[in-house]
């Protein structure tokens, strides 16, 4: 098994040249309702060298933590990245993403978010991205996957788009060109039907 610490320090996030990352000053918020999963992700992040890890057990608590750390424009203790679970009581990951992307404070609205889900399908990725997730991971998350996606949002952030009813990172879809076309394919009805099937 690869050492997660060396994985995070040596991953290039898609580049051919290796980079070294100093993540000691980074602050990551984990929003996860299962304590075991939250602790597992915390220990992986510590192995990567992340200096500050904050946990919340539901979307509503996540909002409180984000507001506390990122609500003040002059704060030096901002959360840099949010890892959030999709399905949780008291505010799920999609609700939290919608709140973040609709927030009036840029320090919250542009915060990178990695959505985690136990369901592996293209539709999960599409719905997650439609709600503003920068990246989507399938649980159980490996150290390699987490390090790769974390460094990707740090090193190669997606440009943000504003469209009617949507603000968030560009999904970089391969099958639809820019040219002003609607790039999002999930409607509220699609999301409702998806939740009914779970």
Which positions does each model-derived feature cover?
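Two-component/phosphorelay signaling modules centered on CheY-like receiver
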Residues: 35-60
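Alpha4 helix (beta4-alpha4-beta5 surface) of REC/receiver domains from two-component response regulators
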Residues: 42, 95, 109, 120-135, ...
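Active-site residues of response regulator receiver
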Residues: 80-87, 117
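The feature encodes the CheY-like receiver
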Residues: 89-90, 121
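Short amphipathic alpha-helix used as the core "switch/output" element in two-component signaling
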Residues: 92-109
């Amino acid at each position: 098994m690869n050492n997660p610490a060396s994985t995070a320090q040596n991953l290039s996030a898609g580049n051919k040249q290796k980079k070294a990352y100093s993540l000691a000053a980074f602050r990551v918020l984990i929003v996860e309702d299962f304590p075991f999963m939250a602790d597992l992700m915390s220990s992986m992040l510590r192995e990567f060298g992340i200096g500050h890890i904050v946990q919340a057990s539901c979307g509503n608590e996540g909002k409180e933590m984000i507001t506390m750390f990122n609500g003040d424009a002059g704060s030096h203790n901002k959360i840099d990245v949010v890892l959030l679970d999709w399905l949780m009581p008291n505010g799920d990951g999609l609700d939290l993403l919608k709140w973040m992307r609709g927030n009036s404070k840029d320090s919250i609205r542009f915060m990178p978010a990695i959505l985690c889900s136990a369901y592996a399908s293209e539709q999960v990725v599409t719905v997650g991205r439609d709600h503003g997730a920068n990246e989507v991971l399938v649980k159980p998350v490996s150290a390699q996957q987490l390090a790769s996606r974390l460094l990707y949002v740090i090193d190669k952030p997606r440009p943000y788009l504003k469209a009617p009813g949507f603000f968030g990172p560009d999904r970089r879809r391969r099958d639809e060109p820019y040219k002003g076309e609607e790039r999002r394919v999930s409607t509220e009805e699609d999301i409702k039907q998806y939740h009914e099937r779970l």
